[in-house]
Amino acid sequence: MGAVIFSDVHADSVAIRALASCIKTPLFRQAFGQVDNLINLGDLVHRGDRPQETLEMIHTLSREYRLVSVLGNHDHAFLNRLLVSGSDPASTYRHEQMRGSPLLSLFDTMPMEWSDRGMLFVHGGPLDLGKQTLRLKCWQRLSHESGDSFAGFHYTAPMAFEALSVRGLTHMCCGHQHQNICCRKTPDGIVEKPIELEPLSVKKEDDEYHIEVARIPLDVPTLLRVGGCHGDEPEFAFTDFTTFSFIRINSRD
């Protein structure tokens, strides 16, 4: 029993539909158990060209599971009509067609962050830096050096662990940068742990999805950044709050 976590769908309804299908398969349930809730780390919109279908799928999932969502920087930009890169004319047109849609109601009360059982869930980063756009939590970026940037404020792992500690939190799960990363605060210092995804099982003839996983024990304070749930090999995660599993899937040909 635990939570499925996904981020950066970017209007890719095919990818989020694949996730929804995968977590119902016997193989997934045997490996991870019952899914109690879904956690969306933001960026449902922009870049892709199926925003309506994506938001319809999110509304469907909210009826099937307890769904918690936090705001992403592209969600923030879309809602506030801020120009950001990455969307082609077709994507821009289809997003503009969504203005005024009741499907956008899910953003009405969407928070910037959420926490549960000692873990902070946020799109970008944990720092309280005021209300300037690029310093908001949904725009912050995990990096090796800190400072302001045209793409959002860069923070380091030590800064994140300090911010968590002040709030009595132990772990953080974020998205935003579309690449998995794991930083563990060990007695010997902060260590970036390589993430090596391996097949969950030998692919059988009746397996609908090929699932790869990398499991991380949550026995020390940990920063976990989840890859993007878009494209041909959507990435997401599962946690029971004792172990965190990075997951990548691809559909059977």
PLM feature spans:
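Active-site neighborhood of divalent metal-dependent phosphoester bond hydrolases
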Residues: 33-35, 47-121, 127-128, 133-159
